[in-house]
From Swiss-Prot:
Gene3D superfamilies named in the record: Ribosomal protein L6, alpha-beta domain
GO molecular function, one term: structural constituent of ribosome
A Pfam family annotated for this UniProt entry: Ribosomal_L6
Subunit description: Part of the 50S ribosomal subunit.
Keyword DNA-binding (UniProt): no
Membrane-crossing segments per the record: none
Protein name, UniProt field: Large ribosomal subunit protein uL6
Similarity remark: Belongs to the universal ribosomal protein uL6 family.
Keywords: Ribonucleoprotein, Ribosomal protein, RNA-binding, rRNA-binding
A single GO BP: cytoplasmic translation
């Protein structure tokens, strides 16, 4: 049984939390995030520590308790440190370019794919085959990186495509001739 919800969240220096009727706003050096949480979970701030309390031990309350704590912790980490996902491109002629806030990908199609950066997300290109997606919201960073990856997922025969750095792609044998 997970006990994530019972863990205390420690506010780093420079991070402020405001709770107005379970609409929580977290401000930090990298920005500000706001999210509405369930009214069943009580959020208490004591100095630099945040604790969450549930009214009873029903299964539904336990799941909401753990989820709320994880989301709140991600907000605190996001505004203080930020999140990033790295993607790598493998394939002949596969490359990426930046045009303002737009990411332009050449991934073996007849046309280039363009990805507009959502609000709060930045794209970086350390080299033409590596893409770094960064921002303060873990959810939006993950969704944006997953969308970029979905434009050309790694295929199992040659491994060509866009993958997360360190991702293992299972390879298959090709057909054998007679």
């Amino acid at each position: 049984m997970s006990r994530i919800g019972n863990k205390v969240i420690v506010l780093p220096a420079g991070v402020e939390l405001a709770n107005n009727d379970n609409v929580v706003t977290v401000k930090g050096p990298k920005g500000e995030l706001t999210r509405e949480f369930s009214k069943d979970i009580e959020i208490r701030v004591e100095g630099t520590e945040i604790t969450l309390h549930r009214p009873n031990d029903s299964k539904e309350m336990k799941t909401i308790h753990g989820t709320t704590r994880a989301l709140l912790n991600n907000m605190v980490v996001g505004v203080s440190e930020g999140f990033k996902k790295e993607l790598e491109m493998r394939g002949v002629g596969y490359r990426a370019q930046l045009q303002g806030s737009k990411l332009v990908l050449a991934v073996g199609k007849s046309h280039p794919d363009e990805v507009e950066a959502p609000e709060g997300i930045t794209f970086e290109l350390p080299n033409p085959t590596t893409i770094v997606v960064s921002g303060i919201s873990k959810e939006v960073v993950g969704q944006t990186a997953a969308y970029v990856r979905s434009l050309r997922s790694p295929e199992p025969y040659k491994g060509k495509g866009i993958r997360y750095v360190g991702e293992f792609v299972r390879r298959k044998e090709g057909k054998t001739g007679k």
